[in-house]
Regions:
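Residue-level signature of beta-propeller blades and closely related beta-rich strand-turn architectures
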Residues: 16-18, 48, 62-66, 138-141
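Loop/turn-rich, solvent-exposed surfaces of beta-rich toroidal or solenoidal domains
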Residues: 114-192, 198-201
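Short coil/turn segments at the loop-to-beta-strand junctions that recur within blades
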Residues: 6, 12-17, 99, 117-119, ...
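Short acidic, low-complexity segments enriched in Ser/Thr/Gly/Pro
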Residues: 2-33
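Structural signature of eukaryotic scaffold interfaces centered on beta-propeller domains
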Residues: 24-59, 63-66, 117-131, 193-207
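Beta-propeller blade signature
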Residues: 1-11, 71-96, 145-170
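Active-site cradle of extracellular carbohydrate-active enzymes
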Residues: 40-118
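A short beta-strand motif characteristic of beta-propeller blades
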Residues: 10, 25-32, 106-114, 182-192
């Protein structure tokens, strides 16, 4: 890819900042804000709340460490980017000299309460038939959560205001909603599916 000039790359700064951060969690010093391990699943889709919208955005999900000793890793984190003018950021990939050309911040940063998972959303896929976003994970290990393998994020609903706790303080964030369907945990209200194969790949092909 370096010699053949087959692709261009864009640097995403926001996940790096969260990955490199050191925070206070339950009175202990922990590395990585929101337990960010980098980025993993990604997809293109319309804005949340506008499933019929023609404009497509890039959605990038964080990898999230499954550390069961911290309480700030029970949400999935998804960044939204408008890539219409990303041509100005595009640069050659040089693995020995990585560039820093890219947007300083995401257009939006969303949180989804799924409970603990192991390394966050492995595969994220927008399904045009339902208008929803499918998120496959490796199961979490906290017994207080149902630990599903697959979650469906409701694409018809706009993000709402919410509060999470990070670095020993409350933070106002944008929250996305899980779609109805599948199993619903009586204690947490979290909905999802037992579908371990989603972590190996997801590809909506239409028609439901």
């Amino acid at each position: 890819a370096e010699k053949e000039d087959l692709l261009r790359t864009v640097y995403l700064q926001e996940p790096v900042i969260d990955y490199e951060a050191t925070v206070q969690v339950d009175g202990k010093v922990k590395e990585h804000r929101y337990a960010c391990s980098g980025i993993d699943g990604l997809t293109f889709g319309p804005a949340f709340g506008d499933p019929k919208g023609k404009k497509q955005y890039l959605y990038v999900a964080y990898g999230v460490y499954g550390d069961t000793t911290r309480s700030d890793n029970d949400h999935q984190v998804i960044l939204k980017y408008d890539i219409d003018k990303w041509g100005k950021y595009e640069s050659h990939l040089l693995q020995g000299k990585l560039h820093r050309s890219g947007p300083k911040k995401a257009m939006s940063k969303y949180f989804v309460k799924t409970g603990n998972s192991t390394y966050g959303i492995q595969n994220l896929a927008y399904d045009a038939y339902t208008g929803n976003f499918y998120a496959a994970v490796y199961r979490g290990k906290k017994s207080i959560f149902p630990n599903y393998d697959l979650f469906v994020i409701d694409g018809s609903k706009k993000a709402t205001k919410g509060i999470i706790t990070t670095d020993n303080k409350a933070e106002k964030v944008e929250m996305l909603q899980l779609a109805n369907g599948g199993r619903k945990d009586a204690n947490t209200g979290i909905t999802g599916w037992v579908f371990p194969w989603g972590s190996t790949g997801l590809c909506p092909v239409g028609g439901g």
